[in-house]
Amino acid sequence: MDTGENVKDITMGNQQVTITRIAWLSGIWDGEGTFGIYRYRRTKDGKWSYCARLTLSNTSEEMIQEIIDIFRSFDITANIWRNPKPRKYNHKKEVHITVDRSESVKKGCEIMLPYLVAKKNRAILLLEFIRIRSEYKRKVDRDPVTGRLKGVIEQGYEDIIHLYEQMKDLNQVGTLDIGSSETTR
């Protein structure tokens, strides 16, 4: 029986990642993972900052290790955090994966995109967010008399805020009327 494992190989460095493994990763992320745009307040000036992030939590060490192996094949940097104790006494300890470097998030979205079903729209939105952020050029505001730096001129935030709001709506938990695929736990 052909499992599809030998359909096509994508060579990355010394390792080969098959289409089957990428499709598997995409299926796992479609069901268990999150494509997100996160907003947080900067401490110095109190303004909002936005970042792209891929996250997944699971209790299977084998699954987490396979995901990490695939990510390493593509030079995707992921942070791993193991919960030291379960949330409840009868629960297993969960492991959390976070990918938050823009280049790694972009690679992750690009390799999974062809195989995503439920969260394809989120991956596309995240890629658009990263594209806008990568094209952003800082413009400084200077005092016209002294030439002294007054700060950075905010630009492009309207598009980013719009994408953040769209992603927030898509990732809303428990609202089936807007097509959320997120599970209430």
Residue positions per predicted region:
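Internal intein/HINT superfamily modules and their associated LAGLIDADG
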Residues: M1-R185
